[in-house]
Amino acid sequence: MRLVFMGTPEFARACLEKLHSDGFDIAAVYTKIDTPKNRGMKLIPSPVKEYAQSVGLSVYQPQSFRDEETVQQLRELKPDLLVVVAYGKILPQAVLDIPKYGAINMHGSILPQLRGSAPVQRSILNHCDEAGVTAMYLSAGMDEGDIIEIRKTAIQPLETSEELMARLAQLAAPLCADTVRSIEAGTAPRIPQDNARATYAPMLSKEESPIDWNQPARFIVDHVRGLVPWPVATAELGGTEFKIYRVEYADQKTEKAPGSVVALTKKGLLVACQEGNTVLVRELQAKGGKRMPAPDYFRGHPITIE
C-alpha cells in the first residue's frame, strides 16, 4: 500500500518513524513550512521534516491545498491512503477524494469527546481521568469521521500536557501502523460517532494563562498542568509576575485570602486558594529569567510573607 504522510510536531514524528521502520511504502511526506524561532528568527524545520529528511523521504511544504497545482502534485504521487497526524492544515474534499482508501487520522482524544485542535491540553484542563488516541477516517467535518479504533490511558495526577502528549505519541505510533495494516487487509471497521456525545477542544490562547486563586486546589493544579508547554499559566506573587510551570497539592490550611503567599518552604511557595486551602508552587520563571525551582529563585530574590 502506497502512503502519503501528513504531519508536523513530535506527536506526528513518532507515527512517521514507526511507519518507516515497519517498512511501509511512503511516497512522500507533507508538513508545515519552517517557522522562525528564538531571537535570531532562524527558520526551524518541523520534527516531521527533520526525520523525513534524515531517512531520505521526499518532503513537500505547501502553503495550502487551495490551488489546483498543489492538489495535482499530490494526485501524481498516486497514494492509496493518506495518513494525517497533527498536520495543522485543513484538507479539502478534493484532497480526501484522491486516495483509493481515503484518509485516516490519529486524534489525541477519546472521540467523540474533545474534537478540535487542543484535545490533550483540554483533557487535563477539563479534569478528565482518562485520555487516549482515536484512529479515524477523515471527513469534511471537524474530527467527525468514522472511528476505527481507540486506545486509552489513565492521566497521571501531576502529569503536564507536554508529558501526556509524549505518552500518547507512544500509543499513537503502533496504533497508526496497525490501522494501516487493517485497512490493507480489509478488516478495518467503520464505527459512526455519536454526535450527541461530542465535546470540543478549542485552540488555547494566552488569555487563559492567569491563575484564578479563588478556584479549588484541583482546578488550579490542572490549570497549570494543562497549559505546559504553551501558553503557560501566569500569576503575580509578592509583586512579581511569573510563569508557573508546576504546582502541587498541599495539606496546610490558612486564613489568608486566595492568592496570598502563605510560606516559603524547602519544596516551594505555599499560596492560598479557595476555602482556606493551599497549593505548592514548585517551578516558575520570572520575566527575563530562567525556568527554575521556586526555592532556588527566592533564595536569590527574597519574598515578603505578610
Report residues per predicted region.
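N-terminal glycine-/serine-/threonine-rich beta1-alpha1-beta2 phosphate-ribose binding loop
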Residues: 36-78
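A short, local hydrophobic-aromatic micro-motif
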Residues: 27, 104, 145-148, 245, ...
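Short beta->alpha connector loops
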Residues: 8-11, 63-66, 87-89, 227, ...
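Conserved beta-strand segments of alpha/beta enzyme cores
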Residues: 25, 56-58, 102
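Donor/substrate-binding cores of folate-linked one-carbon enzymes
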Residues: 21-22, 32, 81-200, 205-207
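An anion-binding loop in the catalytic cleft
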Residues: 214-306
